[in-house]
Amino acid sequence: MFCQQSNNGYWKFENTKINLIRGEVFCMRLLIIAPEQIPVPPPMGGSVEHCIYEIARRFSSSHHVTIISKWRTGYAKTSKMGHVTIHRITASSSKNYLSKAIHKAKGMAFDRIQIDNRPKFVPAVKKAFPSIPISVFLHSTTFISAPMTTISQANKDFKGADLLIGNSISLEHHLKATFPHHSHKVRHVHLGVDVTQYRPSARRQAGSHPFTVVYAGRLIPKKGIPVLIRAMKKVRETVPSARLFIAGGTGKPSYKLHLKKLAGTLGVPVTFKGNVKHSKMPAFYASGDCFVCPSQGHEAFGLVNVEAMASGLPAVASRNGGIPEIITHRQNGLLVTDYRRPDAFAKEIVAVATEPGLARRLSTRAREDVLQKFSWKATAQKLQAIYISKLR
């Protein structure tokens, strides 16, 4: 039994309640099908898988959550943590993974199935479990647009789902505008951060030097790292000690080489840290004085901004996608409207470096806002409330 009856005859689910019907005991049994590429929890990177793991952990006190994800050497085939069970499977392809995931789930009882970031999985899952409601939790526009799919195909895939959940209001609006036939299904749930793990660093409070800018994210063109490197050249005209640390991996070594050559040509000191384990990310943020997110493509949410803010770092970010839902300009961070221009970023970075009062104010407010709005507990509670409202 995964929940308990309260004195007033309702079953409690944190801030939500379900009336008992005909005296039946009901506890939500949720199946989450993760993408096929990275295990849950991910050793490093894998923001989608990281989110699945963190949210499921917060669900577990009230419901039973089963996760199916990829297996990798070093992982158990099955893990149990409280009311969360993770089954990991080997697969040679995306199609093979889905087939094995469905086979693994057969024979188990679920009240809802959540598919993360893979709309194309919906038809096969719906065919296998026709009576179970399916939600699609989307973390970006990548798998609902070219070259991964077409609008027409995504429309067909969404037919089998009763909920489409985006990780920001921006993504919610995009889904409603792009798929109007499914607009009634769309909701949003902001992501969160472990506020006990990510916390302000004594190093920055001591005002150490040199001035260090940090970036965390994939090394791909739409993340805007060349814009940041060029901005750093401008920053160094005012702050000669300024340097850049970059954490993140790339699928194309040639792109990383391109970034290194650009930094060398411009005379910007850049240290590439590579893929950093999740357990080491708090220390990475602690090494910085300012965090920059120079995204050039649509950033659905921008979880790295929340991690940096929880760490007490002043954040400078593109006014793009869901980022303004996290950062309010000159209150808890700095937004760059003209984010194609390196000098626009340089201006805000220099402000953080040369105005200690501003930096302290942004840092304090950023931490306060994350504590209030962006904890994983808050994420899980909102998602849970959406699911339970559909079960009434």
For the regions a protein language model found, what residue spans apply to each?
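Conserved donor-binding/catalytic core segment of Leloir-type glycosyltransferases
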Residues: 31, 165, 206-223, 229-232, ...
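Carbohydrate-associated surface elements
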Residues: 170, 192
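Glycosyltransferase donor-sugar binding loop
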Residues: 243-257
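Nucleotide-activated donor-binding/catalytic signature segment of Leloir-type glycosyltransferases, i.e.
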Residues: 256-276
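Short alpha-helical donor nucleotide-sugar binding micro-motif in glycosyltransferases
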Residues: 275-276, 284-288
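Acidic donor-binding loop of glycosyltransferase active sites
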Residues: 286-300, 313
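A short, well-ordered alpha-helix in the C-terminal region of glycosyltransferases
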Residues: 344, 351, 358-373, 382
